[in-house]
Design a protein with these regions (language model features):
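Short loop/turn segments at strand-loop or loop-helix junctions that form parts
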Residues: 101
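A helicase ATPase "motif cassette" and its flanking acidic/Ser/Thr-rich regulatory loops
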Residues: 98
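Ligand-binding pocket scaffold of soluble enzyme catalytic domains
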Residues: 127-128
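N-terminal accessory segment detector
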Residues: 1-95, 104-122, 136-151, 158-160
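A contiguous catalytic/ligand-binding core that recognizes phosphate-bearing ligands
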Residues: 131
């Protein structure tokens, strides 16, 4: 199933719409199946869908893995807009390092009591994007705001 993305809708607004559907569905599944089974079912399905969607976008993007990663990243940034606060640490040909110190996405999912769902819908996408750039782009991240960290530490290494 192809997913159409409306570039005029901010990513935060899209995520809020998704949450309005997914959170009640997840709660209903928990009531029927139990929390552990429902969480596993939903996170597995969303994780696979998101992974496949990003890899499909990468396959349709021309260029080397690094060029694909750069193109998809550049295309996504306008939709993210000012909904994250970035502290740039290093920007060089072989590395990009920054911290996200504020995240309206994490605020949104904490407000509805579902930060793990937010991590699957958003944070894991960064790993999928890095996979598009592999083996030329490598992401290391040890913490995210969504999972309780003080900031999200993005450390990209670029290889030739």
């Amino acid at each position: 199933m192809d997913i159409e993305i409306n570039p005029q809708i901010s990513l935060l607004d899209q995520v809020k719409i998704q949450a309005q559907v997914l959170v009640p569905l997840l709660k209903a599944l928990r009531a029927e199946l139990g929390e552990e089974r429902a969480n596993k079912l939903v996170t597995t399905a969303l994780r696979e869908w998101y992974h496949d969607t990003v890899l499909r976008a990468g396959a349709l993007t021309p260029g080397s893995p690094k060029e694909k990663w750069a193109a998809l990243t550049a295309a996504g940034m306008p939709r993210i807009g000012a909904d994250i606060d970035i502290q740039m640490l290093k920007q060089a040909p072989d590395a990009i390092e920054f911290n996200v110190t504020g995240c309206r996405y994490a605020d949104c999912f904490r407000a509805v009591g579902e930060p793990e769902l937010g991590a699957v819908l958003l944070c894991e996408g960064d790993d999928h994007m890095a996979e598009v750039g592999s083996p030329e782009v490598e992401l290391t991240r040890t913490q995210t705001i969504m999972k309780g960290g003080k900031y999200c530490d993005f450390r990209y290494r670029m290889k030739s």
